[in-house]
Amino acid sequence: MPLELFDTADQEVRLVETPPAGSDTPVGMYVCGITPYDSTHLGHAATYLAFDLIYRILLDNDHDVHYVQNITDVDDPLFERAARDGVDWRDLGTSQINLFRSDMEALSIIPPKDYIGAIESIDEVIEMVKTLLDEGAAYIVEDAEYPDVYASINATDKFGYESNYDAATMAEFFAERGGDPERPGKKNPMDALLWRAAREGEPSWESPFGAGRPGWHIECSAIATNRLGHSFDIQGGGSDLIFPHHEFSAAHAEAAHGVERMAKHYVHAGMISQDGVKMSKSLGNLEFVSRLTAAGHEPGAIRLGVFANHYRGNRDWNAESLATAEQRLATWREAARAATNREDAIAVVEQLRAHLSADLDTPGALAAVDNWAAGIDTTTDSKEFTEVGNIVVAAIDALLGVQL
């Protein structure tokens, strides 16, 4: 069943443009990864769970998927946390990357084909920055001490198309989310950093435009387009990345490669709050995946708790969310042990496909299985799923990533 998703750039739900089903050409999907300085919290997990659903639906539609994810393993938050804890930033990054991968595996999230760190893509970034400089889309600030390289916001005539934000909103988010509008020497306050000239105490790499390290946005531009092509199918992440990160990543790639759009579809997942308050490190109200699984909560219940609300909305997580999900899991298992009506089983599988293909309508998908389960007489002592029950069990595993 063809997949439709909301496109942030076009502000509408529309069909995802893919190569023909069964072809040798994969669907290209790039999702921004973590900065590895803390454990994986539920906000991270919810984003990757949304794109895991997309991956599963594409596989169900007989598509191969080339899934790429980056790791921002050289960045200020990582350095700051390492300094605070008195550890080497490389060791901190490695430990958190390993924990992240372990959490994703625990949640049955299909791993990317390419999992690329910023450090290992330094040469790719340097090449793209050089291209932007050669094309006049970037410049070096006149600063003898720190000759940083910036991308001109005017390098493309479509800047702003991905986020659809007005100038005031862009300026606000640029300042709040890693931008440096007051940096002396910039031609425009909104010009984005491409290459940070070497500073004492910071890692740096040699380049034709001086020693330094990559800016945040250009890392994703280089990693994505070097693996998926200059214009690929799906670019994704959390809604907090819509601007500036995804807007600038697209602008850098489009200016460097001369394409209209870096991605055909821009997809974003909403934020997660805890008991009505946005999860944040500063508030200390993060719900960590590793703690939930260590406490004995099944990964399938965590997935169902997240899927109870639509991926694009900002969602709340609390103890009731998990309790409801665990009860749902138990109810579905009971139904699968007693199911005998093959037509009903086949029908609910098709309903699952239909809901998930309609912009990941997980509430509708879960309700469809609930309705199927409610119609089954579960007075049985059997501990095994019936042959008919296994039809639904297999679909729930393949499409929702939930094992009964």
Swiss-Prot record:
It comes from the Bacteria. GO terms for molecular function: ATP binding; cysteine-glucosaminylinositol ligase activity; cysteine-tRNA ligase activity; zinc ion binding. GO terms for biological process: cysteinyl-tRNA aminoacylation; mycothiol biosynthetic process. GO terms for cellular component: cytosol. It catalyses: 1D-myo-inositol 2-amino-2-deoxy-alpha-D-glucopyranoside + L-cysteine + ATP = 1D-myo-inositol 2-(L-cysteinylamino)-2-deoxy-alpha-D-glucopyranoside + AMP + diphosphate + H(+). Its cofactor is Zn(2+). A motif ('KMSKS' region) lies at residues 278-282. A motif ('HIGH' region) lies at residues 34-44. L-cysteinyl-5'-AMP binds at C32, G33, I34, T35, T47, N70, I71, T72, W216, G238, S239, D240, I272. Keywords: ATP-binding, Ligase, Metal-binding, Nucleotide-binding, Zinc. Its EC number is 6.3.1.13. A motif ('ERGGDP' region) lies at residues 176-181. Binds 1 zinc ion per subunit. The keyword Metal-binding applies. Zn(2+) binds at C32, C220, H245. Monomer. Catalyzes the ATP-dependent condensation of GlcN-Ins and L-cysteine to form L-Cys-GlcN-Ins. NCBIfam families: mycothiol_MshC. Belongs to the class-I aminoacyl-tRNA synthetase family. MshC subfamily. This is L-cysteine:1D-myo-inositol 2-amino-2-deoxy-alpha-D-glucopyranoside ligase. It comes from Corynebacterium glutamicum (strain ATCC 13032 / DSM 20300 / JCM 1318 / BCRC 11384 / CCUG 27702 / LMG 3730 / NBRC 12168 / NCIMB 10025 / NRRL B-2784 / 534). The gene is mshC.
